Design a protein with these regions (language model features):
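Pre-ATPase regulatory/linker segments immediately N-terminal to the P-loop/RecA-like helicase/translocase core
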Residues: 1-99, 155, 172-196, 313
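Conserved helicase NTPase catalytic core signature
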Residues: 72, 81-83, 87, 174-259
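Phosphate-binding P-loop
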Residues: 89-90, 98-107, 129-130
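The Walker A (P-loop) glycine that initiates the GxxxxGKT/S ATP-binding motif of P-loop NTPases
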Residues: 112, 165, 264
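Conserved RecA-like ASCE P-loop NTPase motor core of nucleic-acid helicases/translocases
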Residues: 116, 121, 125-154, 160-164
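Conserved helicase motor core of SF1/SF2 NTP-dependent helicases
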Residues: 132-134, 142, 231, 245-314
Length: 314
């Protein structure tokens, strides 16, 4: 009996395209006479938001506690005091916004109503930040928004590593996803061969010491290669891009960033923002709180304040 969780990419008439958790499942599926699909609601995002809020509430010290107090109390945000930089290709308000980002030690807001060049300003702010930092985290509430800002950064010549389910990423950014770059890495063919050997060895189901020793060696080598490929991809990337909930992806486990940029922050759920903020030393919010608020269908949740964003609070 074969059981695993996958993602439905799309379905039409009698055809369904399913994104598998790893390529090794393809071989397993080919051996099955019949397949069944059981659809269920994915509660992962809600679980991650609850966990993030719990950590924020429980924080007694450290950077997370500092940022929480800045957002929810009258604790002042700190600033650097160096001279303003000039960006002749930007207008005065855009130039001021970029400098506000560079001056911020804790939190900054880039407020950009439609037509004011908010995206241009944000890309410039990220570009200038990368002159001072080796890597930044860029997030947004939706995959569409993440892809949009990521495309602009790629057009600027910045190495972007897109984290997230490839079925939710647009065609232009697909080659920048972690999965595609992982499979394109020079060490991947060797890793694929080892994974294949592990699957074949499992089919033998022997219990001799030599069988276990060989399995252990193969697994150890596979893990070594996986870590080496991951280290290479993250070492080369200047921008790590994901949705807010995607910041909890297993490949980002343990990662910390000096700066987090949240685009379309006025449409981002407050609880989701904290998933990404937990990984950051300072936070830059970009958006327009006068536009549409985040989508919250529950009346009870709206009454409880879920419709209010961090951008409004700050």
């Amino acid at each position: 009996y074969l059981s695993f969780t996958a993602t439905v990419s799309y379905a039409e008439q009698d055809r369904m395209v399913v994104a598998l958790p790893d390529s090794g499942r393809i071989v397993d599926l080919q051996r099955q006479d019949a397949l069944g699909v059981q659809l269920f609601f994915d509660e992962t995002s809600y679980r991650l938001m609850f966990e993030a809020l719990d950590r924020v509430i429980r924080a007694r010290s450290g950077r997370l506690a500092d940022l929480r107090d800045i957002f929810y109390t009258k604790a002042p945000a700190s600033r650097y005091t160096f001279d303003a930089m000039r960006f002749p290709w930007l207008n005065a308000s855009q130039e001021k916004a970029v400098n506000e980002v560079l001056w911020a030690k804790d939190v900054a807001v880039v407020h950009g109503p439609p037509g004011t060049g908010k995206t241009t300003t944000l890309v410039e702010a990220i570009f200038e930040t990368l002159r001072r930092e080796s890597q930044v985290l860029v997030c947004a509430q939706s995959n569409m928004a993440v892809d949009w800002i990521s495309e602009k950064l790629v057009d600027r010549g910045i190495n972007v590593l897109r984290i997230g389910n490839p079925t939710r990423v647009n065609d232009k950014m697909l080659s920048f996803t972690y999965e595609r770059r992982f499979e394109a890495h020079p060490d991947y063919p060797q890793l694929w061969s080892i994974r294949k050997a592990i699957r074949e060895l499992r089919q033998q189901r022997k219990h001799a010491d030599s069988w276990h020793q060989k399995m252990d060696r193969l697994k150890s080598r596979a893990t070594e290669l996986e870590l080496r490929i991951r280290s290479s991809l993250f070492g080369e990337a200047r921008v790590i891009a994901s949705t807010l909930t995607g910041a909890a992806n297993r490949v980002l486990e343990g990662e910390k960033y000096s700066t987090l940029f949240i685009d379309e922050a006025a449409q981002a759920l407050e609880a989701a923002c904290w998933i990404a903020i937990r990984k950051a030393g300072r936070v830059i919010l970009a958006g327009d709180h006068c536009q549409l608020p985040p989508t919250v269908k529950s009346i009870m949740a709206l009454k409880g304040g879920l419709g209010k964003t961090l951008m409004e609070r700050i």
